Amino acid sequence: MKIPPICCVITQLPQAETLKKSEGAAFYELRLDLLGENWRETAVLLNKPFMATCRRSAEGGSFKGNEAERINRLEKAASAGAFMLDIEYSTPNLEEVLGRLRPQAKCLLSHHNFTDTPSAAKLKTLLKDMLTHQADIYKVITTATSINDNINLLNLTKEIPDKKIVAFAMGEPGILSRILCPLAGSPFTYASLNDGNKSASGQMTLAQMIEIYRSVNYANHT
């Protein structure tokens, strides 16, 4: 059965049995800020590639160290096998950080808006600003306050067709864009390993996402 690539988010040390149920994932995202020192043990358990993310509190995470420590943790993740690193657009000295990390792993440049979803024009301007920095994938995530907000995010991926752009909205009203973003051009979408691993509002479990794609016969729509 064909389904879109799904990045399965892991926020706590998983049981081996739980990982066996995640075969439908294309790869994992390890939340280094939430896993703490357990991230290394978790990485060893994985049977698929993984991306590493280490969020500051301002970006919805829990990392309490300084920036040097945060970047160092991402470097350690790359050394441990992470094929991609999520770097926030708000990162201080962004160009320097990207220059330091890109030789070690692919970089996904991300922006998160935890308040609302800006207009289509503002999102386009934001994306163009992000594209002035060299990255492998660009991610724009907002918070939906209405169903209509999904449209702005789904259309955003079409603005620069030659770039890889992940765009969807958080929150219950944004679930639609989480499901449909691969059909709109996003290279992948996100899901949690299970209910205990959810890292954002509106995030569905991997099993739920797979069941939805199976129900609508996703392969016939691509």
Swiss-Prot record:
InterPro entries: Aldolase_TIM, DHquinase_I, Type-I_3-dehydroquinase. The active site is at residues 112, 139. It comes from Dehalococcoides mccartyi (strain ATCC BAA-2100 / JCM 16839 / KCTC 5957 / BAV1). The keyword Hydrolase does not apply. Involved in the third step of the chorismate pathway, which leads to the biosynthesis of aromatic amino acids. Catalyzes the cis-dehydration of 3-dehydroquinate (DHQ) and introduces the first double bond of the aromatic ring to yield 3-dehydroshikimate. Its EC number is 4.2.1.10. Homodimer. It catalyses: 3-dehydroquinate = 3-dehydroshikimate + H2O. Disulfide bonds: none annotated. CDD domains: DHQase_I. Keywords: Amino-acid biosynthesis, Aromatic amino acid biosynthesis, Lyase, Schiff base. Pathway: Metabolic intermediate biosynthesis; chorismate biosynthesis; chorismate from D-erythrose 4-phosphate and phosphoenolpyruvate: step 3/7. The keyword Cell cycle does not apply. Belongs to the type-I 3-dehydroquinase family. One of its GO terms (biological process) is 3,4-dihydroxybenzoate biosynthetic process. This is 3-dehydroquinate dehydratase. 3-dehydroquinate binds at residues 29-31, 55, 178, 199, 203. It is an enzyme of class 4 (lyase).
